[in-house]
Design a protein with these regions (language model features):
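Acyltransferase
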Residues: 73-134
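Pocket-forming structural segment of enzyme catalytic cores
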Residues: 1-76
Length: 134
């Protein structure tokens, strides 16, 4: 669903379940977000695993996961994405300046916690690969 604005910048995300892919993350963690569409309901049969005031930030359905936030972004990527939105007049200079004020080494360091989901996901994949065929 279109939000009418952007969620962009380092934002708090809250775990809403006890999913293995988010294991080891604090109940509230920081992650970079950039989107203008909110996930307002999970697909049929899916479980919400993370969210914030902007909607669902993560869900799981069986052995498939989806997240709305961007744990893969480094400082350079976060800055380039924000500047690009200003260059394409998707957001005002004032809005982008506010985002760029938050693109700091401290926020990036805090957001690195979210990168744990990569290792957690690989662990699930390896476990699934080594399990006997059904």
């Amino acid at each position: 669903e279109h939000m009418g604005s952007y969620e962009i910048g380092y934002r708090e995300v809250e775990r809403t379940g006890d999913d293995r892919v988010l294991a080891g993350l604090d109940n509230r963690f920081l992650a970079f977000t950039t989107h203008q569409d909110a996930v307002v309901e999970t697909p049929p049969g899916a479980t919400r695993i993370a969210g914030n005031d902007y909607g669902i930030q993560g869900f799981r359905k069986g052995r498939a996961w989806g997240v709305q936030f961007h744990p893969e972004y480094d400082l350079d990527t976060a800055e380039r994405i924000a500047v690009k939105k200003r260059d394409h007049e998707m957001l005002t200079s004032a809005e982008i300046d506010a985002v760029l004020d938050g693109v700091t080494p401290e926020n990036y360091d805090r957001a690195c916690e979210a990168k744990r989901l990569f290792g957690n996901f690989i662990g699930v994949v390896e476990e699934t690969r080594s399990a006997p065929a059904r």
